[in-house]
Amino acid sequence: MIGRISAAWARCELALAACLAVSITALILLNVVTRSLGAALFWVDELAIYAMAWMAFLGASAAVHFGHSVAVTILTDTLPLALQKIAAKLVDGIVLGFALAMLWFCWRWFAPLALIQSGFDLAAFQGATFNFVYAEPTTTLGLQKHWVWSVMWVFALGMTLHGFANLIGQGANPEDERS
């Protein structure tokens, strides 16, 4: 069950990452055209950067599900098969630990309970926590940066899901996909 949920989530991550890749290309082309016409749109660069960040985090999370992450296997290739499997589970455990740490950092950074306790009053929240995550605007888009930074939640939740699925043996098997 968890493996199917992980696979569906990874497909969604990849689909959204692909849409973002197309949007980055379109934004860069728009930027080139408008600059060559002498009417540059000042917000295009920032939006392309944010789209690229979202694309990278979504792709990285999906890569964990599909087992397509970068790996140095010089040591594990020399091990007997049984030890290779143990090493792979150890890596899956470390990835899950990293994902859980990311969730914890997001929890600390966004402080949702403190925000609720302040009655969603940003001034009271900032005064009590000295946390200005919800107040900082983007440079040119006029959006609150917490919307941009929310990709960290998506990344951490996806990595946790994929890491757990891989650890219990329900993640995608890269060897099965190659055949």
What are these regions (language model features)?
Residues 1-179:
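Alpha-helical transmembrane segments and membrane-interface helix-loop junctions
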